[in-house]
Amino acid sequence: MSNRKTTIGDNIRKYRKKFGISQDILSKRANLAFHTIAKIEAGSTQDPRIETVKKIADTLGVTLDDLIK
């Protein structure tokens, strides 16, 4: 599980930086709390809800698969 959480967080960070978006901007655009994005990227949150990851994917303009693989 820890590897999956890290992978999701790493992928979110990769795409966020690729598109030049800060955690703060991503959280506002996805209508999520800043700490939610920060914790997922750090891998320190319990398994992130699929709905949350989907919101992030949609906001970044990538697929859910892009973030979980």
Predicted features by range, described:
Residues 6, 17-18, 47:
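Short amphipathic helical patch at the helix-1/turn junction of helix-turn-helix
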Residues 51-66:
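DNA major-groove recognition helix of helix-turn-helix/homeodomain DNA-binding modules
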Residues 1-7:
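A detector for short, charged/polar N-terminal pre-domain segments
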Residues 12, 26, 37-40, 67:
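Conserved hydrophobic/aromatic packing and binding residues within compact polymer-binding modules
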Residues 32-47:
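Recognition helix of helix-turn-helix/homeodomain-like DNA-binding domains
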Residues 10-29:
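Short basic helix-loop element that most often maps to the first helix and adjoining turn
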